[in-house]
Amino acid sequence: MDQKQIEEIVRSVMASMGQTAPAPSEAKCTTTTCAAPVTSESCALDLGSAEAKAWIGVENPHRADVLTELRRSTVARVCTGRAGPRPRTQALLRFLADHSRSKDTVLKEVPEEWVKAQGLLEVRSEISDKNLYLTRPDMGRRLCAEAVEALKAQCVANPDVQVVISDGLSTDAITVNYEEILPPLMAGLKQAGLKVGTPFFVRYGRVKIEDQIGEILGAKVVILLVGERPGLGQSESLSCYAVYSPRMATTVEADRTCISNIHQGGTPPVEAAAVIVDLAKRMLEQKASGINMTR
């Protein structure tokens, strides 16, 4: 369908509504008759930069200040504009870039050097590689035999609180937030007078693996910090799953208390650490977690 046919349909529809059809659009556009767009699309722009995220694609807005304020208030995909019924090129490219970034953080590995630099004991689940981790979640819920022996030999037994870190589905969530959440979390637990276990890193772990860990070490409360499944453009979100007196055979998902969306754009890691300390204290007082806790 060419432009003439489109204009004919518009005139027909407008006439049926009793309104005057707009004049046909000119084939050419000069600087004196066409206003410049508010923003321009650029292939040179880094699609992961703050500038790209703040980009406003609505051309010739009636209230540009409203769009600017809306764009600043959320990380959602607003004010991207349209090219007819389709998204603008810049918006589409950023969508694809964010999708690629999310896939990358799922497939990346936490470097062994990073784990050693943090002074963490590293163990793993029954999973041996990332592909198996994504296709066999059941194996990510159990420690391998070597890990069980390592925990028995190198970790504090019968702690009040055991903190575990796992890569989960987001490597970035661990490496980006670690420095701001683990030190204040450990310090807060110790200041509360609690016996804190040896923190360690579980490679290829799923949430339920904390049940086996708690059972092996005799922990009253197990706190698992694990990378969340990334969303578009948000690959650094961390979750905390806390459970009281976990047992592999009897603990169910309703027994866990979850604090999610821990990152700089959500609940700041330092603030989350304080919330987790308070949560652990209440769990020990009430001897419960999940739906069994009272407010």
From Swiss-Prot:
Gene Ontology CC entries for this record: ethanolamine ammonia-lyase complex; ethanolamine degradation polyhedral organelle
Chief localisation class: other
Keyword terms of this UniProt record: Bacterial microcompartment, Cobalamin, Cobalt, Lyase
Key word Electron transport present: no
Keyword NAD assigned: no
Function: Catalyzes the deamination of various vicinal amino-alcohols to oxo compounds. Allows this organism to utilize ethanolamine as the sole source of nitrogen and carbon in the presence of external vitamin B12.
Entries under NCBIfam families matching the protein: PRK05465.1
Descriptive protein name: Ethanolamine ammonia-lyase small subunit
Organism the protein comes from: Escherichia coli O139:H28 (strain E24377A / ETEC)
Gene giving rise to this polypeptide: eutC
